[in-house]
Amino acid sequence: MNARALYKRPPPVSSSQSEASGKRRTRTLDALGFDNYIICNYRLVFYEMMASKMKDRKKTPVSHKVIEKRRRDRINRCLNELGKTVPMALAKQNSGKLEKAEILEMTVQYLRALHSADFPRGREKGELLTEFANYFHYGYHECMKNLVHYLTTVERMETKDTKYARILAFLQSKVVTEPVFGSLGTISPDPTDLLCQLEYQSPSPTESVFQQSPPGHFSWHSSTRSPTLAYPAMSQHSGYLSPVQGLDHHYMNFIGHNAFSLHNAQHAAL
């Protein structure tokens, strides 16, 4: 129903009906007033027009800007997933934020290595499990490092605090009893040894960011407290290599050593 239908010409009426309707209209105008009568009629017309505009707006296609934003969001989401999936990109996460072009290049190199004739196929389940456990433990220790940094710098907890020791002991017990990688859990440092390795360093007000140490040793510096958490070198344990060393040597030879450098010149300033 639109405004034109409201003002449709009425059918012809008799003189008696016309007089009766005129009397009713007069009584309505006397009760509401002429201004209110006009406002009520126009308000009804206005509501009908707004309803038709809303229906037309719903039929309007999505703007080009919205489509472009959705497309960029999908691209960025997929690139983030690639950065967490490709081993070479995962190993370089600590050296700084990777550019989109770098992630795509590493993905192409990784796929070429997978499809190359030199790359071994049909690897043993135990070998794959060992490699996956390598990345699992490396990521777990990275999370523990960040948690210890948070507890000592933000929560102001002392290393001799009972709650602090219980948290680290709980995390260590979880990584040892992991059902998937439980057979490799013995390579993780003992909770007691881990607590003994926590020590204070001299305060350094100018350094307030994490610094990556050589493989097998993680440390960070803070403006308040600077505990150092040193894990046993991963390469010292049989079947448990560092993330870069754990990659298959055929993959390394195919891509090249420079692609795996964790201290690339592009990220030296970070």
Swiss-Prot record:
Residues 59-114 form the bHLH domain. One of its GO terms (cellular component) is nucleus. Residues 136-171 form the Orange domain. GO terms for biological process: regulation of DNA-templated transcription; regulation of neurogenesis. Gene3D superfamilies: 6.10.250.980, Helix-loop-helix DNA-binding domain. This is Hairy and enhancer of split-related protein helt. It comes from Danio rerio. Keywords: DNA-binding, Nucleus, Repressor, Transcription, Transcription regulation. It holds the Pfam family Hairy_orange. PANTHER family: BASIC HELIX-LOOP-HELIX TRANSCRIPTION FACTOR, HES-RELATED (PTHR10985). Residues 1-24 are annotated as: Disordered. It is found in: Nucleus. Transcriptional repressor which binds preferentially to the canonical E box sequence 5'-CACGCG-3'. CDD domains: bHLH-O_HELT (cd11408). The keyword Transcription regulation applies. GO terms for molecular function: protein dimerization activity; RNA polymerase II cis-regulatory region sequence-specific DNA binding.
